[in-house]
């Protein structure tokens, strides 16, 4: 999209807070945006701060025929810089999220904002903070968010010293929906109508005041629908401040980052996160439409789980927790019920208390180790047994040892104090050249996810 802006040199009064009529904008190509080359405009025409963060929208209050003629016969000032965001996306494809964030804030200043949902996209705010540039953050308050999400909003504001710009749904539209269909109509006829009122329309209003926005979309969040996300693009759906298709640029700094790496970054930087993550929530939205996922499930399976039942039946029902025939709900009051052991592959080393203590003391190991802290009665441990045994068989003879340590009963206090045990199962990686184990941060415990994390830290 190309935006051609003609500015008269006769007076600076043509710059005001009113918007360009959409008819004054000439469309060329989606994928590129023509920005005014401010360095070629005289100071008499524009009064701009040297800081990009203070640059406001260039808008015309009134353009007379005389001023247009005058500008054409004197100095030509409609010099434009063509920004090809498709080409920029290619150049930034292998850039770090920090570099991409810095480029976005540098280019758009106060006309760009971070969209924050209250989940792991808090990483975007940390990256923006690390650039040292001013930045804006907005969030959609649907009125149906979890209390934990609202508390995170408050914590983030205090942690970074910012004010989140909240967008709310239209009260009349919400009232009509609830009165006509009730509070939970989405369980009956799908979530699209409710989301359109509570999320999409407020987002449109927010974006109409911007020229660019920053999202936390990642390719691995939904391989079927998000696998082609570029790090920057001209938004093909929403409109920006100047109006019209192509008037808004969308930045996705973490598009190429794996979820595990995002979490490692959050932990390393000690960033405040939503406490729902510790309860098994990965993708977090409105309270009625979000639930925790089970080990091995994809993170998006915790959202709108009642829809497209046939298409998602295998993934959903496979993770369902069934009543344990060993009676673990009543028999293991002290966490030491007599139930069959798990993780029984011949390639899984069974560590004793002394064995894992010795492993912790080693500073220069010959091999890396991946160890699961488990309780055999725990349904989440049982659910990951097959994938962990498969991992052990896959890594046999590879230079990585796979082990288990039963951490319930008398060993639980030790495991909490010395082994970072929070809940079962907890997975630790003991790198070759480090005595301190690294805790696996994700609820995704399939073979590929575990292998990917292991390769990053071993």
UniProtKB/Swiss-Prot annotation:
Keywords: 4Fe-4S, Amino-acid biosynthesis, Chloroplast, Cysteine biosynthesis, Disulfide bond, Iron, Iron-sulfur, Metal-binding, Oxidoreductase, Plastid, Redox-active center, Stress response, Transit peptide. It is an enzyme of class 1 (oxidoreductase). Residues 1-69 form a transit peptide. Disulfide bonds join 378-381. Residues 8-23 have a biased composition (Low complexity). This is 5'-adenylylsulfate reductase 3, chloroplastic. Its cofactor is [4Fe-4S] cluster. Residues 1-24 are annotated as: Disordered. Residues 70-319 are annotated as: Reductase domain. The C-terminal domain may function as glutaredoxin and mediates the interaction of the enzyme with glutathione (GSH). Active in GSH-dependent reduction of hydroxyethyldisulfide, cystine, dehydroascorbate, insulin disulfides and ribonucleotide reductase. One of its GO terms (biological process) is sulfate assimilation, phosphoadenylyl sulfate reduction by phosphoadenylyl-sulfate reductase (thioredoxin). It comes from the Eukaryota. Belongs to the APS reductase family. Its EC number is 1.8.4.9.
